[in-house]
């Protein structure tokens, strides 16, 4: 039974297991999410549900999106995402999905936007070794040769070079749910997840259950 939620990353902390081991966890506010649309193979070619998260003022939402939301009989939402499922019949438009959809010990995948680091060199961006620090070296953090002059007289695609680091979509797979607070829609997830504090992430069943 697949499921997915939109969540907000609140930060990291640590908890202690019964055997005294310290576990680093990420705290996320998972839901409540409202089902806005149900897609089926018969009507759309695939099975999925569209959910909204965090209420928003109507004036801050585009008119086409506002009309789409009102067709579902709901108010405006700040974030709308779609999750592909194989059993959409379980859901109806207007249903609320909360953090208790997940269980302690369950494994999940978390998708978010990594923290942007700006324009960085090849050492920070790709882990290049760099040149010598002394003995007359004039080559410290430079990328070195990026191709030959005679042939092919061009730079190959995907050559590792300086550029923008971070600020891209990242998925971390097979993270374990350590604790579920259904009253406050809080999930404690073992380990780190991509993104900054208060960033929006997608929490869904892992594609690697074993």
From Swiss-Prot:
The keyword rRNA-binding applies. The keyword NAD does not apply. One of its GO terms (cellular component) is cytosolic large ribosomal subunit. Pfam families: Ribosomal_L3 (PF00297). Keywords: Ribonucleoprotein, Ribosomal protein, RNA-binding, rRNA-binding. One of its GO terms (molecular function) is structural constituent of ribosome. One of its GO terms (biological process) is translation. Transmembrane segments: none annotated. It comes from the Bacteria. Belongs to the universal ribosomal protein uL3 family. Part of the 50S ribosomal subunit. Forms a cluster with proteins L14 and L19. One of the primary rRNA binding proteins, it binds directly near the 3'-end of the 23S rRNA, where it nucleates assembly of the 50S subunit. This is Large ribosomal subunit protein uL3. It comes from Geobacter sulfurreducens (strain ATCC 51573 / DSM 12127 / PCA). The lineage of its organism: Bacteria, Pseudomonadati, Thermodesulfobacteriota, Desulfuromonadia, Geobacterales. The gene is rplC.
